[in-house]
Amino acid sequence: MKHKRLSGLLALLMCSVLMAGCAGMAAIDDYAVNEGYELKVSSSGTGNKAGSGKSTPGISKDKIKVGVIHLSDPAEGSGYTYTHDIGIQGMQQNLGLSDSQIVRKNNISDTDADATRTAIKECIDAGCNIIFTTSWGYMQTTAEMAEEYPDVYFSHGTGYMSNGRNFNNYFGRIYQARYLSGIVAGMNTRTNRIGYVAAMGSDSAEVTGGIDAFALGIYSVNPDAKVYVKVTNSWFDPQGEEAAARTLLNMNCDVIAQHCDTVYPQTLAQEKGVYSIGYNSDMSKEAPDACLCSVTWNWSAYYTSAVQSVIDGTWDGSNYYGGMNENLVSITSVASFAAPGTQEKVNEAKQQILAGKNGVFDGVIETNTGATVGTAGKTLDDSTITGGINWYFKTVSVVE
């Protein structure tokens, strides 16, 4: 999702930061304040941003207890919650924690602050000393609970709030993998009409930035292809996601990509005999004859480092923004039935990204309104990528 997601408010905040002089790819140290909480966006490279700079008391591994708040049930399939829980399981295995040291709260609506508060409080009452809240809508309640319980560590996924002490934010450069998946789509469409099921519209920089990165990847290999976006206005809506995919198929789109939580766009593509691009985890198992590749998260990379920092006493409230170099985001191998040369083209572009020679949002970029963003010879900075992309690339159209 997910989730979840930079809002128009964040974009406004970031605009003020940019006007103050942020630009380029140099290391940044940008802050904005929202209701008393410090907003921090990490620089590229290491994936971490300095927090308070103060060390914290370590907690012995046998005393660690981890809480995780999930939007849905991990057992539901290959979507967002499943992927986060695979990351939690990976962390547990990496650190040698027992099952009793993990407390899960599933099916917690991120639009219900009372339910979120109750779930977090139950984790605290169960003895959890670090709690991960995985969906955008948990952000405000997580921030409030962090102030109420300063001795508990809180880590919120996909938002922007943090306090530099016991509450941080984590997300990743998923746009890098989106770009690569765009190359795959662009090399395999026959109609030059590619569909994209999007959870949110242009007020979400996370979703819109992903669409633009995808479209830029397509454009790099097939400038004649167009991207058609259908928005569901929900992070998790199985029926709505399938309906959106069906609309795009009816428009003669022959590749369906997605930024939403379930596998329904994939299974519909499988049923209708067209190609698809999965998201969150490898969705080829649900759509073996359709899925060309999947844009994936390896959340265990972050969860392991975060819990280890609490054990070691090195937690400092840093925000985390990892990418391909940190093994947080990637795409799966291209399907054997893809067009010849697809995997080779992806490999070439991936090496350029890893080497810092392709920042995805490079140079002057033309939007679908005819306006331009960016500067020749420069890459959009992290503040803009995470909070200021409310425009669509010139090959993108939104379907009403």
Language-model regions, residue ranges each:
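A residue-level marker of the well-folded mature domains of exported/periplasmic proteins
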Residues: 24-400
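Repetitive helical segments and hydrophobic/amphipathic motifs
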Residues: 13-14
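C-terminal motif of bacterial Sec signal peptides marking the signal peptidase cleavage site
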Residues: 17-21
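Bacterial N-terminal signal peptides that target proteins for export
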Residues: 1-10
